[in-house]
């Protein structure tokens, strides 16, 4: 999946001679949005888009995602022909309320924890910290314990308790590797420290990629199994994202944290910080990882897309779904 990000305030998206361009502020500089782009992420509140540019983008299958200052998607423009089949959604509505939904929720949490283990092992090797291997073992034991439980006795509270136990050890490890100047003490999406804000912004980009993949696979992003369904809340998108957070966002931000200068302006990341975070996360989405299901190394964005289709297929056929386990 190819993504183009617009961060600069005052940018205009226009159509010229069949091409879609971004014009930055008052300058005459025009940047062509390549025609093979899948998604344009608009990450500034002061960007204008012409209706002609929207029409041309729609014909090319390009959608626009708008992020708020925290990086959360708040709106999306996409072509009306994404996926016209209703079979997947009918199965989704029928299966998610019973045993299938509980099994799927368990698999999502299990996969999230396993991918956290993979990142901690990678960091242990990268930072040459033997103590991190012990942390990886502790988190892996939580995943093993969860794996052994009968899904029929699981509810959301039990699953969240496993996720919380793993997260405590995981985020303590991440915090120990970061400079004290960032003020990061653990994951809190409401915290105003620099690294939590960078994580929020990176996750916002990941949300937009995952939601697009689910929509194109024919799934309803608003009916999930782990996050409580609520009007206007993309519960399935939030569920699906959980499996990819560690590898897609946490990894690139942790290993590049000393290369980027994060700064706050008016209680939010400034423009340069958002550009840096977006660049790092998007570059990582183009990196190849071993996708356990296929035993092949593929671009992370393609793995996300492929896994959404696999989830849709399993739901449509009533088959057991296996999460997106990755190897760095």
Descriptions of predicted regions:
Residues 1-16, 22-25, 32, 59, ...:
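Active-site helix-to-loop segments that bind/position phosphate- or nucleotide-bearing substrates
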Residues 27-28, 36, 58-61, 65:
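An N-terminal structural lobe/cap that precedes and organizes the functional/catalytic core
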Residues 34-48:
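Extracellular/luminal Protease-associated
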Residues 40-43, 62-68:
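Short hydrophobic alpha-helical runs that function as membrane-insertion/retention elements
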Residues 45, 69-72, 219:
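An acidic- and aromatic-residue-enriched active-site/binding cleft used to recognize and process polar
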Residues 50, 70-76:
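Short gly/pro/ser/thr-enriched loop/turn and capping motifs at secondary-structure boundaries
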Residues 52-56:
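A short acidic, amphipathic alpha-helical/loop segment
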Residues 79-83:
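Short low-complexity, flexible loop/linker segments enriched in glycine and/or proline
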